[in-house]
């Protein structure tokens, strides 16, 4: 297995698909890496030479923020918003949608599973 940016990439994957296993590199950036380093997209990871893998590692380290650095930067950005006590920070703190989505009848993913209201008992119907 090729190890790039601390991630084991499966041997049988195509190069541009295998690079997307790295957090922070999607289809667009993997294609950009392949074209700039002149590595064919149809090539598989196990067909790459050690020199090619080294070139990919150096290119990613020089041009992208990936894996732990990107995750840390993302969490620090959210922490900064919360510390500023701005609207976006307060929405993050309350675990509600941040970008203006409605919450009255949706936002189940962000708010979590629906919770029944405790303490209310149904009264039996009178005849």
Curated annotation (Swiss-Prot):
Record keyword Nuclease present: no
Endpoints of the signal sequence: none
Gene Ontology biological-process annotations: translation
Key words of the record: Ribonucleoprotein, Ribosomal protein, RNA-binding, rRNA-binding, tRNA-binding
Domain of life: Bacteria
Pfam families membership: Ribosomal_S13
GO molecular function, one term: tRNA binding
Subunit and interaction comment: Part of the 30S ribosomal subunit. Forms a loose heterodimer with protein S19. Forms two bridges to the 50S subunit in the 70S ribosome.
Described purpose of this protein according to its UniProt entry: Located at the top of the head of the 30S subunit, it contacts several helices of the 16S rRNA. In the 70S ribosome it contacts the 23S rRNA (bridge B1a) and protein L5 of the 50S subunit (bridge B1b), connecting the 2 subunits; these bridges are implicated in subunit movement. Contacts the tRNAs in the A and P-sites.
Protein name (Swiss-Prot/TrEMBL): Small ribosomal subunit protein uS13
Organism per entry: Pelagibacter ubique (strain HTCC1062)
């Amino acid at each position: 297995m090729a190890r790039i940016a601390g991630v084991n990439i499966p041997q049988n994957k195509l190069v541009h698909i295998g690079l997307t296993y790295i957090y922070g590199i999607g289809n667009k950036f993997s294609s950009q890496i392949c074209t700039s380093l002149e590595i064919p997209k149809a090539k598989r990871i196990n067909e790459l030479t050690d020199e090619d893998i080294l070139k990919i590692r150096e290119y990613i380290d020089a041009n992208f923020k990936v894996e732990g650095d990107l995750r840390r930067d993302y969490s620090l950005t959210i922490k900064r918003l919360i510390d500023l006590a701005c609207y976006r920070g307060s929405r993050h703190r309350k675990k509600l949608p941040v970008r203006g989505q409605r919450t009255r009848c949706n936002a189940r993913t962000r708010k979590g599973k629906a919770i029944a209201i405790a303490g209310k008992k149904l009264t039996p119907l009178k005849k």
